[in-house]
């Protein structure tokens, strides 16, 4: 991670079957300078996706979303700044439309306060980062995917290297299995 160069850690966790599958990579151009943002709204599989500057804030944001049975959370310095619980499939809430709109606007302001760039929707950006049917690079529970070549890539940054261990899974919408040879 290098927030000074606008590079933060990104992680996607499988949240439906308890498989423990995860993908870890990096996100550039998001603007985050502190804290973490997590959401269970992540197309198409709606797994848990977290972007952050520190592992501890990422873990807290992810845990807040897990405890809420889905949602959107913003964390800074070990403090949960805000959460929109989405307990219906991790995508919906019994709250009124007005209450949801107000909470989303509050969370967007909080994310902007952490450095998310103006003009970027912090939550929809994360929702599409994991969608492995649109070019070019996407991160899902299989790892970093080169969508056009349909390959899992290794991720490294400086001395840190991440090996995404899940192989043999399906790329959503591709109809092809990823084989260990393509890793």
Stretch-by-stretch model annotation:
Residues 1-183:
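Active-site microenvironment of metallo-dependent hydrolases
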């Amino acid at each position: 991670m290098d927030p000074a160069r606008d590079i933060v850690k990104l992680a996607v966790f499988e949240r439906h079957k308890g498989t423990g599958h995860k993908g870890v990579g990096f996100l550039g151009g998001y603007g985050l300078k502190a804290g973490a943002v997590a959401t269970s709204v992540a197309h198409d599989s709606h797994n848990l996706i977290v972007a952050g500057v520190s592992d501890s804030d990422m873990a807290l944001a992810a845990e807040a979303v897990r405890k809420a049975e889905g949602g959107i959370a913003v964390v800074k310095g070990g403090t949960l700044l805000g959460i929109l619980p989405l307990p219906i499939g991790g995508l919906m809430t019994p709250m009124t439309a007005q209450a949801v709109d107000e909470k989303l606007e509050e969370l967007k302001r909080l994310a902007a306060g952490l450095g998310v760039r103006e003009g970027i929707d912090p939550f929809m950006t994360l929702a599409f980062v994991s969608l492995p049917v649109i070019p070019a690079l996407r991160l899902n529970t299989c790892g970093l995917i080169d969508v056009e070549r349909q390959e899992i890539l290794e991720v490294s940054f400086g001395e840190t290297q991440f090996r995404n261990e899940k192989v043999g899974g399906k790329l959503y919408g591709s109809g092809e299995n990823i084989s260990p040879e393509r890793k």
